[in-house]
């Protein structure tokens, strides 16, 4: 007998990578091994030297096919085993450097359903009722997409992902799922696999999933990926939380440059955001760059929430940056990742 292994990877499309997958039939008793693909068709290699390598890094049961079938998330490498479009390696390296601090993450992944070029459930002409009743709402026409959300949630559970919850978001057609609490790069692995499952399940309904930061211009909420972060030190005391919050304010441009496409469109100071170029932090403040949950402020220990990452962010880059900035500050080191150069695209000057 044999089983099906769905090899899943992140391609090299810019500025937002796409997810790709293909099926391999493997004999029972054998594990998924490295495989290959045509990188010239995924923006990861030239046509004259197009072979790329898929190296398995994370496997789960396949909740769609069932049985003994598997999902296999892969790193992409060239045939010399270097990873030019693979950001997972950066997250792994900095996580190992500060492993003694136990940096951990929970990510709130927002997204928007689309059908026929409009947010799912919106009228063919015009707009739905203003924002207000949709966030965590219930009832009929207000909550389009719930069937997909329910199937996705169960699929994540069946796959063994660390899904913590789901909810409808502020704009009609917008939802969220949460993954955590996990270290890096495992949190990135599970976010990417959760995204793939969402795309795959939405296919069955003729619905598309968008992770665009500001899918609809105007007086509508954007879509983010609020990233909750803790270390052994922050879980033990308030001073470490303050150190992390202050450290994040010293590298504003470095962070927002790598927090996803369209950061200036979403982080405007409206719709529960802080301006992208003005850093702030505070307790219970959803208009701050970094929020301290009320329970954390009361206990004087716990975690912080960076509200700046977009829904389309690369979780490997975001977690690598947060570990580098926060843990280096706690250790009295200098951060080493993603120091801007003349070739680094960045928004205009940021301030604290």
From Swiss-Prot:
Its main location: cytoplasm. It catalyses: L-glutamate + NH4(+) + ATP = L-glutamine + ADP + phosphate + H(+). It is an enzyme of class 6 (ligase). PROSITE patterns: GLNA_1, GLNA_ATP, GS_BETA_GRASP, GS_CATALYTIC. SMART domains: Gln-synt_C (SM01230). It holds the Pfam family Gln-synt_N. Belongs to the glutamine synthetase family. Disulfide bonds: none annotated. Residues 3-82 form the GS beta-grasp domain. ATP binds at residue 164. L-glutamate binds at residue 272. Mg(2+) binds at residues 108, 110, 169, 176. This is Glutamine synthetase. The keyword Ligase applies. GO terms for biological process: glutamine biosynthetic process; nitrogen fixation. Residues 87-352 form the GS catalytic domain. Two forms of glutamine synthetase (GSI and GSII) can be found in this nitrogen fixing bacteria, GSI is a typical prokaryotic glutamine synthetase whereas GSII is similar to the eukaryotic enzyme. It is found in: Cytoplasm. The keyword Manganese does not apply. Homooctamer and homotetramer. It comes from Frankia alni. GO terms for cellular component: cytoplasm. Induction: By nitrogen starvation. Its EC number is 6.3.1.2. Catalyzes the ATP-dependent biosynthesis of glutamine from glutamate and ammonia. Its cofactor is Mg(2+).
């Amino acid at each position: 007998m044999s089983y099906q292994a769905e090899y899943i990877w992140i391609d090299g499309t810019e500025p937002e990578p796409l997810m790709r997958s293909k099926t391999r039939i493997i004999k029972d008793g054998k594990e998924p091994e490295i495989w290959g693909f045509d990188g010239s068709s995924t923006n990861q290699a030239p046509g004259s030297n197009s072979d790329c390598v898929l190296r398995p890094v994370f496997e789960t049961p396949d909740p769609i096919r069932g049985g003994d079938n598997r999902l296999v998330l892969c790193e992409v490498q060239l045939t010399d085993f270097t990873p030019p479009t693979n950001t997972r390696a950066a997250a792994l390296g900095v996580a190992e450097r500060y492993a003694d601090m136990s940096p951990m993450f929970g990510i709130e992944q927002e997204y928007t359903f689309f059908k026929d070029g409009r947010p799912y459930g919106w009228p063919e002409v015009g707009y739905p009722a203003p924002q207000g009743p949709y966030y965590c709402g219930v009832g009929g026409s207000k909550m389009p997409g719930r069937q997909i959300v329910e199937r996705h949630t169960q699929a994540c559970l069946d796959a063994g992902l660390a899904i913590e919850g789901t909810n409808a978001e502020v704009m009609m057609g917008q939802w969220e799922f949460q993954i955590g609490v996990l270290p890096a790069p495992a949190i990135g692995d599970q976010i990417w696999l959760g995204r793939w499952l969402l795309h795959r399940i939405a296919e069955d309904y003729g619905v598309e999933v968008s992770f665009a930061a500001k899918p609809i211009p105007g007086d509508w909420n954007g879509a983010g990926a609020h990233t909750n972060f803790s270390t052994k030190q922050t879980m033990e005391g308030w001073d470490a939380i303050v150190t992390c919050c202050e450290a994040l304010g010293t590298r504003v441009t470095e962070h927002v440059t790598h927090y996803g496409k369209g950061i200036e469109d979403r982080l405007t100071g409206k719709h529960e955001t802080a301006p992208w170029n003005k850093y702030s932090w505070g307790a219970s403040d959803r208009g701050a760059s970094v929020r301290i949950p009320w329970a954390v402020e009361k206990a004087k220990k716990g975690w912080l929430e960076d509200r700046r990452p977009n829904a389309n962010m690369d979780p490997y880059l975001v977690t690598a940056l947060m570990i580098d900035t926060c843990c280096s500050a706690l250790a009295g080191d200098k951060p080493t990742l993603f120091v801007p150069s003349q070739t680094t695209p960045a928004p205009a000057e940021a301030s604290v």
